[in-house]
Amino acid sequence: MAAQGWSMLLLAVLNLGIFVRPCDTQELRCLCIQEHSEFIPLKLIKNIMVIFETIYCNRKEVIAVPKNGSMICLDPDAPWVKATVGPITNRFLPEDLKQKEFPPAMKLLYSVEHEKPLYLSFGRPENKRIFPFPIRETSRHFADLAHNSDRNFLRDSSEVSLTGSDA
């Protein structure tokens, strides 16, 4: 009889676990801890950095670098941030970031001052020969790509291997 009481108690405790939902924790590997959603005039911003979701940080981050050099994390869901960053990412990144041939770890640095991208980096974690984080071999400086307006450079640069062979 006592064994039946313990088994019922154990069953009740295990059933309570069904209703427990893990709380959203702050990802410590994300760059932004606190996000700013109030409007910042573009004439005060020097660069905008867009960092897409990675295995280390499960959210998109938008970082504005004002002309004084500090960094301000912007709320990517704020309407003015979407209106500012949307055309930039649509112009310089692939249409569908969820496709398998495009890597999930991407970072874009855009110069508001000069109205051009400065840096794009990404990696492909599913390919063991390529690092899943930005390094020199998987990064492209847009100075090299200024003459190329075709979007296919993203596919070409994402397939840079560490061994130097594409096999």
Curated annotation (Swiss-Prot):
The modification Phosphoserine is found at S157. The keyword Disulfide bond applies. Residues 1-25 form the signal peptide. CDD domains: Chemokine_CXC. Expression restricted to the lung, produced by bronchoepithelial cells and is released into the airways. Expressed at low levels in fetal lung. Belongs to the intercrine alpha (chemokine CxC) family. Chemotactic for neutrophils. Involved in lung-specific neutrophil trafficking during normal and inflammatory conditions. This is C-X-C motif chemokine 15. The lineage of its organism: Eukaryota, Metazoa, Chordata, Craniata, Vertebrata. The gene is Cxcl15.
